[in-house]
Amino acid sequence: MLSKNQRKQILLLKQKKYRIQKQLFVAEGEKVVQEFIDAGHEMHQLYATFSFQHPLCESISGEEMQQLTHFKTASPLLAVFSIPEETALAPSDLMIALDGINDPGNLGTFIRLCDWYGIQQLVCSPTTVDCYNPKTVQAAMGSLARVQCHYLDLAPWLQQSELPSYGAQLEGQNLYTSALRPKGVFVFGSESHGLSDAVRSEIDHFITIPRFNKVSGAESLNVAIAGAIVISELFRSSFPTQK
């Protein structure tokens, strides 16, 4: 049976300050939990409402799981993992950076995108949502087990970087006529505020996804969708054209 203290400690991990203090985070759902297990992340607790073969697994009822979940509907599997020790940002020809992305779902989607395209690091401003927020962990669908998020002040980092930097915004060079390659730092800002002034001042080039419906009332694309389009275009252009 689940103790009151166990329940309290897990629910506290919904808050960033407790995740930092305890250096722990919660993962929910069979796929997400299994991805972290397979990646070798240190696990402290594991709860299941079904028979799950693992030495740490504790069987609990569906009602107890509903008391633990950070979501409206509980998944049948929940685990508590250690937050991995942060390693230094490794040199890479292609970097994705996020400036003030505060929606957990958008960050989770960027993490999935990086994983899909083999980008193992994601650079985030301090104003970007915590990657171990339960909603981000869920949205990343296990990709967080393979992609490391680095939180740092973007402006001085961009200033020191030897890579060319590209900022995504409404006014910029047409993405489809830019002949870009997967080399450089590509920076995405929040939908509501765009790139911060400090970051914008360090950007070398600005790119935009042209709007084809000129009479549309749509003001912008969702930032994660924009990120998917840009990253896909970078890799598409790296393939040789078939004759």
Residue ranges and their predicted role:
Residues 38, 88-172:
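RNA substrate-binding interface of SAM-dependent RNA methyltransferases
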Residues 116-117, 131-145, 200-243:
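Structured adenosyl-cofactor binding patch, chiefly the S-adenosyl-L-methionine
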Residues 25-27, 42-49, 59, 80-81, ...:
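Short, hydrophobic beta-strand segments that form beta-sheet elements in well-ordered domains
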Residues 1-49, 128-129:
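Boundary-proximal intrinsically disordered activation/regulatory segments immediately upstream
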Residues 53-66, 93, 163-165, 179-185, ...:
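Active-site regions of enzymes building and remodeling cell-envelope glycoconjugates
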Residues 57-82:
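Glycine/small-residue-rich loop that forms an oxyanion/phosphate-binding "nest" at active or ligand-binding sites
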Residues 167-217:
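Active-site/ligand-binding-proximal alpha/beta "capping" segment
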Residues 29, 102-110, 219-226:
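Amphipathic alpha-helical repeat scaffolds
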